Amino acid sequence: MLKQVDRLDRVFQALADPSRRVMVERLTRGPASVSELGKPLDMSLPAVVQHLQVLEASGLIKTEKVGRVRTCSIEPKTLRQAEQWISDRRTTWEIRLDRLGEYLAVTPDEPKIKRRKR
């Protein structure tokens, strides 16, 4: 369980950065080279590589070098695990809020106490 929590921490930490989210969004449409991923972000190649290293360490992407070109692709399994974690939390809160709504629907309203004006 602890390994799963550590993995999720790394995933959410990686996704906390807007530039990395742009890269992940782009990779959901298919593999891309490092330079392709950096173009819309207007950042240096070393900065792009640094962001990609964080994404790769989190398990969100994988990279493959063929010749001089490093190609990145998304790891759908990791995204599904993060999505499942969020979905589980959402389900828990939906159940709690439904129960609260049911309770409030059957609970009579308390009379309002009138206060004297000073």
Give, region by region, the residue ranges found by the protein language model.
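Short helix-coil-helix linker/hinge
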Residues: 14-19
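Short, Lys/Arg-rich nucleic-acid/phosphate-binding segment
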Residues: 65-71
